[in-house]
C-alpha cells in the first residue's frame, strides 16, 4: 500500500480558540497546547472532524476517507486519511513599532525545516536578542519592544531568508503581503517565545 504525505499551512485570519474541554477555575477557558512544549496547537482530531463536516463528498466517499461514524451500526474500520496536529509556526505579537510582529523561534524552525526537508541555516538568537530581517519595521533605535519586553535587535541575512521563504509559502500570489510579512518577521530566543506563547495569547472567558 502506498502512502502519500503532504504538509499544509493553516492561516488563521481571525482569533482561533481551540479549547481543551475544561476550564481554569470558573471563568477562563484554556487553549489546547502540546504537552511537552506547552505551545498552542490544533489537534489532528479537531481538524479531521472539521474536514469531515465541511467537505462536499458522497456518503460512500466520506466513509472511505474518514471511516464510518462512531455510532454507526456497521463494522468500524479506519479511514484512508490520517490528519496530524497543526503545530505553531508564527505567533502574532503586539509590537510598539510596526504594530504587530510575526514571531517564531529556532526550535519551531528546526521542526518546520525537518518536516519540509529544508536545508537553510537556522539562526539562533543570543539571550535577550531578537533576530530581524534586513528590511524590518520593528526596530526602535537598536531595540524591538514586544508586549512588555525590550530586546536588542539584530539584523540578520539568514532571518531575512526565512522571512521571505515563509512569506512566499503563506502568500504565494500576493507580493504586497509577502512584503508586509517580511518587514514584521522576528526570530526570538526559545525561552522568550515560550513565555509570549503562554502570556500573549488571547484569553476567552466563560460568560
Tell where the protein language model's regions lie, with residue ranges.
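Basic, Gly/Ser/Thr-rich N-terminal segments that form RNA-phosphate-binding interfaces in CRISPR RAMP
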Residues: 1-207
